[in-house]
UniProtKB/Swiss-Prot annotation:
Name of the protein in its database record: Adenylate kinase
Region: NMP, residue numbers: 30-59
Family in the record: Belongs to the adenylate kinase family.
GO biological process: AMP salvage
Pathway(s) the chain acts in: Purine metabolism; AMP biosynthesis via salvage pathway; AMP from ADP: step 1/1
Region (LID): 122-159
Comment block on domains: Consists of three domains, a large central CORE domain and two small peripheral domains, NMPbind and LID, which undergo movements during catalysis. The LID domain closes over the site of phosphoryl transfer upon ATP binding. Assembling and dissambling the active center during each catalytic cycle provides an effective means to prevent ATP hydrolysis.
Binding site residues for AMP: 31, 36, 57-59, 85-88, 92, 156, 167
């Protein structure tokens, strides 16, 4: 089973990806991991990628698709894989179709922007230990202080509201159109890939149950 998980940053894709990979015994594939592995392995494609990256250029969709095809041919992908953060754009999705990379299921985890802003902007971290809190869902005993050490908690730059809103706007302009793309592809191909829209609000268990039901 080859699965693409779609959803805005903060929608809970990482949590659900973990359940999917464990349930189906498939690896999670991210372009970042693939790029690093190919460069490290020194394959012909890896050397080509290294040249591009060393020059500070963006890796072309063609190279990324070649990388995907090389990766999914490996033994651990025999039963499928879960694509993490790929494809991000319509040209990448079209290139996958053109390259004959079949996808079995596309799952969209939909969460309202304001809910995501609340989730992410409320996070606080104790840097030394990595302990995380949330001002609304999991507040520290003393505001702004770590429960165990009493040291200050910080808000990571990634979690600041303006950063979250910027990432959401990039998602809506670049990646959200994939929802439409895969819905149309599914309709045109007699339901392949199977497309599922899941509301990502509620308990983790409830959302996981919906995701796994969509994939069964």
């Amino acid at each position: 089973m080859r699965v693409i998980l779609l959803g805005a940053p903060g929608a809970g894709k990482g949590t659900q990806a973990k359940f999917i990979t464990e349930k189906f015994g498939i690896p999670q594939i991210s372009t970042g991991d693939m790029l690093r592995a190919a460069v490290k392995a020194g394959t012909p494609l890896g050397l080509e990628l290294k040249k591009v990256m060393d020059a500070g250029q963006l890796v072309s969709d063609e190279l990324i698709i070649s990388l995907v095809k090389e990766r999914i041919a490996q033994p651990d992908c025999a039963n499928g894989c879960l694509f993490d953060g790929f494809p991000r754009t319509i040209p990448q999705a079209e290139a996958m179709v053109a390259a004959g990379v079949d996808i079995d299921a596309v799952v969209e985890i939909a969460v309202d922007d304001e809910e995501i802003v609340g989730r992410m902007a409320g996070r606080r971290v104790h840097l030394a230990s990595g302990r995380t809190y949330h001002i609304q869902y999991n507040p520290p005993k003393v505001e702004g202080k770590d429960d165990e050490t009493g040291e200050d908690l910080i808000q990571r730059d990634d979690d600041k509201e303006e950063t979250v809103r910027h990432r959401l706007s990039v998602y809506h302009s670049q990646t959200k159109p994939l929802v439409d793309f895969y819905q149309k592809l599914s309709a045109a191909n007699g339901g392949k890939p199977k497309y599922s829209h899941i509301e990502g609000v509620g308990s983790v268990e409830a959302i996981t149950a919906k995701v796994l039901a969509a994939l069964s």
